[in-house]
Each structure stands twice: as structure tokens, then as C-alpha cells.
Design a protein with these regions (language model features):
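Conserved "repeat-terminator" motif of extracellular CCP/Sushi domains
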Residues: 113-120, 187-192
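Structured interaction patches on ligand/partner-binding surfaces of diverse proteins
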Residues: 36, 40-44, 67-111, 174
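Generic structural detector for well-ordered beta-strands
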Residues: 49-51, 100-102, 113-115, 143
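Short amphipathic, basic-aromatic surface patches that mediate peripheral association
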Residues: 3-20, 127-132
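Short structural boundary motif marking the start of a folded domain
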Residues: 1-4, 121-123
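Surface-exposed interaction/gating patches
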Residues: 115-134
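Tryptophan-paired
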Residues: 16-75, 131-193
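Short, recurring structural edge motifs at helix starts
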Residues: 16, 111-112
Length: 193
């Protein structure tokens, strides 16, 4: 085996006060080639350092899972699910990357970094009652409904579940101003259509 140093980067977007969109607390790294590897980094410093045999690998990185996900073969990783509970309890957005890595005999890795992307969409909203209807319409609360409980970040193109139990309604958030409210939420993709 050779020693490899692999850098991990995130989408460079401004962080909000509610959640640090670029925070990486832990990483599970899976490599599939002639030999399969799983590495868990419970705290992340750059670069990630590990030992593998030289070769070509399909790589899967899962950031902010909050735990060592254990070994998963190349088939099972396609169906890995992350739950909204993980994101809400850790205050960190799940992030993933899928790609290929080539490791030479000197431990040089191409590409030399993985770029993880958020598995949840940032929704910035503003809701305002028009003057024409203000006498008869007041804002009381905002609630997101029909939210997926889980997503499969590596199962691209799959249609969201049609099972009602796989969805939930978010908490109704009281509004202090009856005419206008704004906020930010992080939601998993819903491909129900």
C-alpha cells in the first residue's frame, strides 16, 4: 500500500446563521477497484490521509453522516439513504461526492481533491400579504408539507417514494408579523412531481 493525501472541498456559498453550509464534521470514504476500501474520519482535517494499493477506484464520499457507516459493497452504496433526522439533530447538512480516483505507485492521487455537495436544497423564502387583501388575510404560520424523510444521494434519477409514510409535514412556525415573513429552510429533493 501507498500513503495517499486527498483534499476535501465543499461548495463555496455563504453560510447562514442557522446552519454552517460548509461544515464537515465527519467523512465516510468508500473506494471500489480491484480492492475495496472504507475509511471513516470522525473529525476532518485537510488532507484526508489513508493507505491503499495503487490503482483506479470509483469513489464515494459521505460527509456529516454522524457515524461510521461501516463496510458497504459497490452495490449497496448505490442505495445508501440519509435521513432528515441526521441533518436536524447534528445541525450539519449531509454532503456527498461520487467520482473516480487514480492512485499511482508514489501515492499521488488524481484528482487530488473531492468536492462534496449538499444533499439538501437551501430554500430562502419571503411571504407577503398584498395590500389589496390585507384586511381579510393575515399570516399566522409557515409550514412546509410533504417533505421526504430520506434521500438516496447516489441513486440518481430515481423517482421519490409514493408511500405516504415516507413523508412528513414540517413544524408550523408561528409568524410574528401578520403581513410579512421571511426565512431559510433546508429541504431534501422531492421527485414526486
Amino acid at each position: 500500500p501507498v500513503r495517499v493525501e486527498l483534499h476535501l472541498t465543499t461548495e463555496q456559498q455563504a453560510a447562514t446563521r442557522a446552519m454552517d453550509e460548509n461544515c464537515i464534521r465527519d467523512v465516510n470514504l468508500y473506494l471500489y477497484g480491484d480492492t475495496e476500501y472504507h475509511f471513516y474520519f470522525p473529525s476532518v482535517s485537510s488532507p484526508l490521509v489513508f493507505n491503499v494499493l495503487p490503482g483506479n477506484y470509483r469513489s464515494y464520499a459521505i460527509a456529516n453522516a454522524g457515524q461510521d457507516l461501516g463496510d458497504k459493497n459497490a452495490f449497496k452504496i448505490q442505495f445508501y439513504e440519509t435521513a432528515v433526522d441526521v441533518m436536524e439533530s447534528s445541525d450539519a447538512i449531509p454532503m456527498t461526492d461520487r467520482g473516480t480516483l487514480a492512485v499511482d505507485g508514489a501515492g499521488r492521487c488524481t484528482p487530488s481533491s473531492l468536492r462534496v455537495t449538499r444533499s439538501a436544497a437551501k430554500i430562502a423564502y419571503t411571504i407577503e400579504v398584498a395590500d389589496a387583501v390585507a384586511p381579510s388575510l393575515r399570516l399566522r404560520s409557515v409550514q412546509f408539507c410533504n417533505l421526504p424523510r430520506t434521500i438516496r444521494p447516489f441513486d440518481s434519477g430515481s423517482i421519490s417514494s409514493t408511500v405516504e409514510a415516507n413523508y412528513y409535514d414540517g413544524e408550523a412556525m408561528p409568524v410574528g408579523n401578520e403581513r410579512r415573513t421571511a426565512g431559510t429552510a433546508y429541504l431534501f429533493e422531492n421527485l414526486q412531481g
